[in-house]
Amino acid sequence: INAFTFASSEVNKFSQTFIKIVEFFSGKLTLKKLYDQYLLENNSPENFWHDALKKLRLNLVTNFHFSKDIPIRGSLIVVANHAFGVVDGVSICSIISSVRQDYKMITHKVLRQAEAVKDKIIPIDFSGTKEAILNNIQARKSAEDFLKDGGIIIIFPSGTIATKSNIFKDHKADEGDWKQFAAKLTLKTNAG
């Protein structure tokens, strides 16, 4: 996971360098250290998301009951805002995996580098290349097939983390416009 960086999806050198700088100052090394510790502990992959919450010292508080509000079988699409980046995915996967193991999250391809959760991720490639477009079409097909088989798909419909338009002003972060993919996927598969 040494190559774990979102900069690899950017095509120009300035963007790659900028992303690497932001990653450095926003805790990437700490996350890498925590992940390396996790690997040494030889924990069960089924508990990865719960273990990640513990390692990050996050206390997840919800206003619903997992076992009552998440169906134990049948296809389901979980649609969520993406306000906090990695924390959103870790939290949602922890909630879902406490009830079921037949789930996958549609997310950035770089996150598949974590071996413990590789099979839980349907990768999206944001590079915009011809190969990326073909891979993303395959990702959509994989999500459809998984839902038709009765699984759960977790999706962040804006496809991006909420951001501030001006980091120097006291504005709230805004979620990007939601893409139509989640709605189309629901209609195409009759998922809940």
Enumerate the predicted regions with their spans:
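Membrane-anchoring hydrophobic helices of lipid-metabolizing enzymes
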Residues: 1-79, 89-91, 100
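Soluble catalytic domains of membrane acyltransferases
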Residues: 56-192
